[in-house]
Amino acid sequence: VENLLVAQHQQLKPGLFSGLLKAPAFRRAQSEALDRAATWLERIGLLEHANRQASNLAYGDQRRLEIARCMVTQPEILMLDEPAAGLNPKETKELDELIAELRNHHNTTILLIEHDMKLVMGISDRIYVVNQGTPLANGTPEEIRNNPDVNRVYLGEA
């Protein structure tokens, strides 16, 4: 739970004396933060590990926990840089489902930087392809899949 509470401290702002005296506003804010943390731990499938340190979780679980840590702050946009790096196929599929849920059910825009094209094509509405720092193409997954420049650069001449 502490893993998710740490992300919410900036939003709570109960004040020093309010916290020391355990004022009603402090208790209410603390309760809401705990509820949000528990909700997100359940959503990512880690509620049974609520009191474990992040470093003691499996690598895929650590990745999901990082995303939940962001989501407790209720962001409008979430930037994920190579979230599938180092994950096995099962963990990548779970990540794909989690990202789709965030986008579809939590009104969160996802900015995804990723090399796993199966993941990118499966969850993206729009894709921007960059080749060695230069923009190459942008469009829907279907447009990118059929783009001759993308195919030439990434698949080679057929």
Describe the function of each predicted region.
Residues 1-158:
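Glycine-rich phosphate-binding loops of nucleotide-dependent enzymes
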